Amino acid sequence: MNQHMKNDEFAVLYRTNSQSRAIEDALRKKNIDYKIYGGISFYQRKEIKDLLSYLRMLINPNVEEALKRIINYPAWGIGATTIDKLTIAANHYNKSIFKIIKNLDKIDLKINSGTKNKLQNFLNMILRFQIDAQKLNAFEIADLVVKQTQLVKDLEKDGTPEAVSKVENVQEL
């Protein structure tokens, strides 16, 4: 078996989606490109992207993609119209959406007081997480984010086997 074979001549089969993370991590560690057929990559699953977006916000709150993903998940009552207004203001003032939220009292966005309170609560939560992240390790801060945002509770409310799988994915991460 001294033949040198190309990576695209190999396949890795696994029985359950929960096994994909270990395989993906090993391949990533070795810088081996891979494709998932018939399933979704562990890191492409919605619940994983949501949690990673929260964690990205702790490192860099100006990442628009992460902020837009989590600003209303779980449901904070911040709708698409509000997000559009924030995006327009961010473009107008050449600031990030996060900076617009931080300076909401200085900008007239025609947002009602209830929505302003929800945005303030969201901002305060992210700022608290950033402070906590300074003294906690990665596992502890991820656990805190999951508990305080009630991500798992939101996933569990479906009560379906898919919901159980999603909760397991979050716990795996």
Provide a role label for each language-model segment.
Residues 41, 75-76:
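Phosphate/pyrophosphate-binding and catalytic-coupling "lid/hinge/switch" segments at subdomain interfaces
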Residues 84-89:
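C-terminal helical "lid" of AAA+/P-loop NTPase domains
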Residues 91-98, 134-138:
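Proline-centered turn/helix-capping motifs that create local helix->coil transitions or kinks
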